[in-house]
């Protein structure tokens, strides 16, 4: 960590290690110890949630589950998989008077402050040092980018805030292989002046730390990579 690192989220509860037995659907995981866990992430997470992999869970009483998956092991470190906390983390990097869940035309963007619209994206996939988003096709994500472009052209400041939920990424790129339409919209957004800020995070014990900002990969807009 660096001298500029700081805590951006505290789970404030013990985290228990377990092992995935089965992912029975997008949102429910059964562990080897027999626990039924809620997985709050719309992505595929196939590189993280698979039988035999290590996960971190905590007690969380739901309608069908008593636990929640918070992180999974990548082989080199923990990756936070709880997407419900993304906007709470994002607030650490925004003014205190920011407005949340702002309706704009046919979309709802995450934040607004001082003539600035902000959309937050959480990234859990890293391949060969590249943080990649999305890990599953996202029409909603593409629509958000198109809205940010329109707002930029209308004179607003538009910002994409990317939270990389692990600390082993060197740079970020849209995931052309998984979602070419989103990636093209991301490229268009940057070319139209939409700003991109990428935060590298790390889970230590039961706290998430901000480590540093990273940049777009040099080949981020290369369709073939």
Curated annotation (Swiss-Prot):
Q: InterPro entries, from UniProt?
A: SfsA, SfsA_C, SfsA_N
Entry-linked CDD domains: SfsA-like
Q: Which GO terms describe its molecular function?
A: DNA binding
* Name of one Pfam family that matches: SfsA
Query: Record's Gene3D superfamilies?
Result: 2.40.50.580, 3.40.1350.60
Family membership = Belongs to the SfsA family.
Its recorded name reads: Sugar fermentation stimulation protein homolog
Upper taxonomic lineage: Archaea, Thermoproteota, Thermoprotei, Sulfolobales, Sulfolobaceae
The gene designation is sfsA
